[in-house]
A protein has these predicted regions:
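Hydrophobic alpha-helical membrane context
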Residues: 10-11, 126
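N-terminal leader/targeting pre-sequences
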Residues: 33-209
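N-terminal low-complexity, intrinsically disordered patches enriched in charged
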Residues: 11-12, 208
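Short, positively charged low-complexity motifs
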Residues: 3-6
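N-terminal amphipathic/hydrophobic targeting modules at extreme N-termini
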Residues: 9, 16-17, 22-25
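Short hydrophobic alpha-helical segments enriched in small aliphatic residues
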Residues: 28-30
């Protein structure tokens, strides 16, 4: 199948509609009811996947991170959302635009994504600190070691369930995207290369659902 990858990033939407970009861009999450909610009492075979799909389609995230590129990838932008689930863990959804392989037709490259200790994306992301690792475990068992992004001609979308942290644990920290894949072996950070994108994780309590 051929076709061009998505190119309009969420930061463009953020800048266009409001100063904060939050209310209008995310207003689709202010839906009170979903088909799943209306039928869940009658259907006892609802799976976690059904719940997760409902969260992504109809619910407001508990926290978000607007991701922007640094000197190495100035056009990179994206949005990472964190949903607290009824199972104790967090559903993570990431959508990233203009990854470095955007200019290579048909290219697919992996990019490491981690939660870092500090919520400071200044100075070309030099102040984000180490991976979020409250239990002091070796890499890749840090609570902040997330699944890698698969960039398809510069665009990546990813969603996964993670029970190593809650949304309250990570608010005020940062999501960092790296120039290379995480090898899940090298210490202390998986030999993931340069930091090319960063976003501070903030509470999304301005959304009323």
């Amino acid at each position: 199948m051929t076709g061009s990858s998505p190119s309009a990033g969420p930061l463009q939407m953020k800048d266009k509609f409001t100063d904060s970009g939050k209310l209008i861009f995310l207003c689709a999450y202010a839906i009170k009811k979903s088909f799943l909610q209306e039928t869940i009492m009658a259907n006892q075979s609802v799976t976690p996947a059904d719940i997760f799909a409902d969260l992504l389609r109809f619910r407001a995230p508990a926290a978000i991170a607007w991701v922007r590129g640094g000197d190495a990838a100035p056009n990179l932008s994206g949005l990472v959302k964190f949903y607290q689930t009824p199972y104790g863990g967090v559903l993570v959804e990431a959508e990233i635009f203009n990854l470095p392989n955007k200019q290579v037709p048909g290219s697919t490259d992996f990019y490491a994504m981690h939660i870092h200790q500090n919520g400071d994306c200044s100075d070309d992301f030099a102040k984000t600190g180490d991976h979020y690792n409250p239990s002091g475990k070796p890499h890749p068992d840090h609570a902040g070691d997330l699944l890698p992004l698969l960039g398809n001609e510069g665009y990546a979308w990813l969603s996964f369930y993670d029970k190593r942290f809650s949304t309250d644990d990570i608010i005020g920290r940062s999501v960092v995207i790296h120039s290379h894949a995480d090898d899940f072996t090298s210490q202390p950070a998986g030999n993931s290369g340069t930091k090319i994108g960063c976003g501070v994780i903030e509470k999304a309590d301005y959304l009323k659902v």
